[in-house]
Amino acid sequence: MINKMTSRIAVSIAVVALVSGCASSGVAQKSEDPVAAKLDTYLLEDGAVRHEVTDKNVASLWQEYDALRRAGDLTAAKGKLQQAIAITPSDAALWSGAAEIELEENSHLRAENYAAKSNFLATVGNRPLRYRNWLIIQRAREGRGDLLGAREAEIESSKLQ
């Protein structure tokens, strides 16, 4: 169920990184996981993962990351994200992508830290990214057995809906 959840988180980054006002249509999928159900409203129909950047190197690395992540090669995908972060360390969406990979690899503390860093770097107006990060934090805390912390993260994410 965690892999299914993190796959949904991965797909939702498309909405997260888009400039506000871009049109997207949600894909409704039934899920037993309430966090995954919340993410469904942020999924694009085609499942595309997009991240708009101005640096050509970062854009290329993002595309490679996305292809590798979709192919299930998380180690190589993580490497591409690390390269992109080295070029643009203040890119909140890159840190969120890194958090997602760490979550999928069950590195819960690192996933939480990366998502928190992404929230710190995200603009106030980027509610979808901040919402996504709080869902990652919630899942990471659940994975560590920190149920009180997970509940706090759930409250924070609900403020952004």
What does each model-identified segment do?
Residues 16-42:
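Bacterial Sec signal peptide processing site at the extreme N-terminus
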Residues 51-76:
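Alpha-helical segment of the N-proximal tetratricopeptide repeat
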